Structure formats: C-alpha cells, structure tokens
Regions:
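C-terminal scaffold of the Radical SAM
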Residues: 1-111, 161, 171-176
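Hydrophobic alpha-helical packing residues
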Residues: 6-10, 123, 149
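Non-catalytic, well-ordered alpha-helical scaffold segments
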Residues: 84-91, 117, 143, 147
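Short amphipathic alpha-helical interaction segments
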Residues: 110-125
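A short, conserved structural fragment
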Residues: 124-134
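Minor-groove-contacting beta-hairpin "wing" of winged helix-turn-helix DNA-binding domains
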Residues: 135-139
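Short, amphipathic alpha-helical interaction segments positioned at domain boundaries
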Residues: 141-176
Length: 176
C-alpha cells in the first residue's frame, strides 16, 4: 500500500518511474542504472569490481592485497555459453517501465516470444502487466510481485528450451 501510494505521490509531483524502485524527473533517469537494465557492456576497475565486456562477465578479487599483487586477479567469470542471457533480458527488462521488447527478444535470442504471451495475458487480467507498443511491461501492482512473475517466466523459457532441444534431438529443426 505504501509503495503504490509513493508511486502516485511521485507521479503527481512530476516524477516518472523508470525502474522498479527508481523515479526521476523527465530526462534525468540514471544512465548508470539503465546501463545494467538494458544489458549494455560495462567495465569495472579495482578490487571487487565487475565487468561485462565482449560476451564475458567477470569480477576482480575483493582482497586489495591480492589485487595489488596482480596474481589471480579474477575471482569469477562467465561466458556467453554459461550465461542465460534470454532470461536475464526478461528479468532486467521487467524491472524497467519500458518492459520487454518482443521483436528484440526474438531477434537477439533466436526464439519465439509467443509462449510467454499466454502468461502475460493472465497477468494483464490480474492487473499486473499491460501491453506496450513493443511488448509487455509490469504495472505498479506487478512490480510488487515481480519476483513471482519472473520465476514463472523463467520456467516458461526453460520449458521452451527443453522442447527445442527435444525436437532437435529427434531431427525436427522447425522453430519451436
């Protein structure tokens, strides 16, 4: 109730909600935050810093002495093969007021968005999501339960991937 009241109050005072927990006057949204939500590349420098460059996500060690010594600088790293970028796109896009761009999803991740539409229609009926010109976004009420929505969408993506893998294993290469 307090969250929805804050959303209304901020809107009445000229602030736009551009992310699940961020508001700004028009034209003043944090470019730093949006870089993460839009899955743009970023570089971090120093102990504990994270980067996502060229399809590789990595983090430097947190311990300053180890960092200065220059030995085993990376504490973790993931490549495109180990990252679930399609799910990350869905999760991060749903944190923004813009929401998911269906054509971008299909073009970038080479999979159909249609299986997710059924879930979004259910969320729309419940007042949790609304269609946009390009796809879907969550409503303020949807932001309140976004974690549950995101988990359901993750399950739907996993089922779609399994269906594609099963079809490919049997020699059926039609787009699933």
């Amino acid at each position: 109730e307090m969250y929805l009241s804050a959303v209304d109050t901020l809107a009445q005072h000229g602030y736009e909600q551009y992310e699940i927990s961020n508001f700004a006057r028009p034209g003043f949204a944090s470019r730093h935050n949006l870089k993460y939500w839009h899955m743009d590349e970023y570089a971090g420098f120093g102990p504990g810093a994270h980067s996502d460059l060229g399809g590789v996500r990595f983090a430097y060690v947190r311990d300053i002495d180890r960092y200065i010594a220059g030995q085993l600088l990376l504490s973790e790293s993931e490549t495109e093969e180990t990252l679930a970028r399609d799910f990350e796109y869905v999760m991060l896009s749903l944190r923004t007021a813009e929401g998911i761009d269906r054509a971008y999803f299909e073009r970038t991740y080479r999979q159909r968005f249609a299986p997710l539409d059924g879930l979004f229609r259910q969320y729309e009926t419940a007042g949790l999501a609304q269609p946009t010109e390009k796809g879907w976004r969550l409503t303020p009420q949807g932001f309140l339960v976004s974690n549950s929505i995101i988990v359901a969408l993750e399950d739907a993506l996993a089922a779609q991937k399994l269906q594609r893998q099963t079809a490919a294993a049997s020699g059926d290469y039609r787009i699933v």
